[in-house]
Amino acid sequence: MTRKIHIFDTTLRDGEQSPGASMNTEEKLVVAQQLIRMGVDVIEAGFPISSPGDFRSVQEIGRLAGDSCTVCGLTRAVDKDIDRAAEALKTAKRPRIHTGLGVSPSHLRDKLHITEEECVERARHCVSYAKRYVEDVEFYAEDAGRSDQDFLIRVIQAAVDAGATVVNIPDTTGYSLPEAFGARIKSLSDNVIGIENVIISVHTHNDLGMATALALEGVKNGARQIECTINGLGERAGNTALEEVVMAIKMHGEELDAHTDVVTPELTRASHLVSRITGMNVQANKAIVGANAFAHSSGIHQDGVLKARNTYEIIDPADVGAAGSEIILSARSGHAALRHRLSELGYTFKDEEFDDVYNRFLEIADQKKEVYDEDLESMVQERQREVQAIYTLDALQVSCGDPLVPTATATISDELGVSHVVCATGTGPVDAAYKAVDEVVAVHGDLAEFSVKAITRGIDAIGEVTVRITAEDGKVYTGRGADNDIIVSSAKAYVNAINRMIQTARSKQGK
């Protein structure tokens, strides 16, 4: 029997640190539900002390997960951080506190301003302190990839002696070469007393494009947990992509003496879900889940694949959920058919909620002959984005053309239910719509990025607009909107981004 490799997903914590990829609690719960469906072993749900939103996310995901997986909260090696994480994790049946500090010379000297001896003592203390609350404590040695190996051994020994159940060896800056990183893991396995009773974890970044290779090299040398994100989301160039390491282990299980429990046909759905929620598009040539991952344009390749798929494909698309049958719904479809299909897509609703969903489905079905999975997912996610809406776009009319001045008339409701009807002109229909919104909302953001794509099929496809706006403090907020009318989609996206900006400000104020 091959070794079980634990998959630790940090999409909701490290992945969310990608600029513009922030998610609210409701969106995190949708992603967490998909991670549970996929069978990941650990969900790192957030950094509880960082904000009330992260605290609530850890609480709610802990409640959602039940016995299905471990739920983890991140902390610094600071007592108050650990106290806060422990409080958030009270809802989890399988809680884990993830605590630690930097261990490289630059971190000790320039960031923490401590000596090596003080670092070792802090490592020992933070693990011991966390063990007062939970049995499962993971220690991270930040920037281990650039640390002195003998010193790293001392730090990890202190964490193991203090009772750590997992020790995380991050290549925080993506600096290491795979073989050298693997040697670090083997050195720890050979020199830390008692480490055979502890899981070694690897957390690698993609700054030099080697995150997956680094993680697999860690597995070859004794690591039994990989920390990763859907689509490789993460700071700077991102983290190890979950879909890549999982499929690499599946394809080379015997060579690596390893397997995972991830349900691989859920990978593509997870990728699309995270992409849509965060507004971070997946590059077409992305391994495993990109639009071109199973596409063949060369005549020679096409001929080969038609004769036998394995001539140019090492993975069956169905193994990652890239192919399969679907139920196509229409205005004639009843409650049962819609509820069944939404359940298969991972969405469940209470009866009173489902009535609203069904009514929205009928609105779409009246505009389209056939409603596909992409329509349903867009519909549900748009509804989730509106859960805590401060401003809601109720109606929009736009007139433009040569020689007309583009004019937008918008009806917008605020959180008190007051309806505002405003009119504005602009350089184009979208600009006019945005200026109309600005007449009502209490804040303003500068448009930094605008993108549009068809997320369903046909000439009557639903178009989704993603915008990123920059607030006065320089922070970027993402908004998304979907509609058959692209101008309406644009206005919805802008309002969504404004709502996020206001919600974030209120969260920081504890409101």
Role assignments for model-derived ranges:
Residues 407, 416-441, 445-456:
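Small-residue-enriched alpha-helical segments and adjacent helix-cap loops
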Residues 176, 183-307:
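Catalytic alpha/beta core domains of metabolic enzymes, predominantly
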Residues 4-5, 9-11, 247-249, 254-423, ...:
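A mid-to-C-terminal "edge-of-domain" accessory segment
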